[in-house]
Amino acid sequence: MEKDPKVAAQVKLILKLIKELSPGNTVELRIPGYGAIQCVAGGNHRRGTPPNTVEMSGPTLVKLISAPELWTELVASGLISASGIASDLSPVFTHAQALYEAN
């Protein structure tokens, strides 16, 4: 399956924004086929996969950055897999939305 270049470019930009807005290594944000970052300060995780993980598709990430209020709905529907006590990234996406729209 070939990646949509437009989605790939958007995912790259979104991951960069999230990493800049919320640096750290408490949560791993995974977008299979596109990339993954570690973000959110506060934990003392140092090696391997953090105990808090969030995974979604590229198109779901693009949808979420445009409508961060959909976080709960997307998690409930299974389009976002979020595990761990620090895995709620909805505040990060709310903050990132304005920066994303400015680009």
Regions found by a protein language model. Name each.
Residues M1-N103:
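Feature captures hydrophobic
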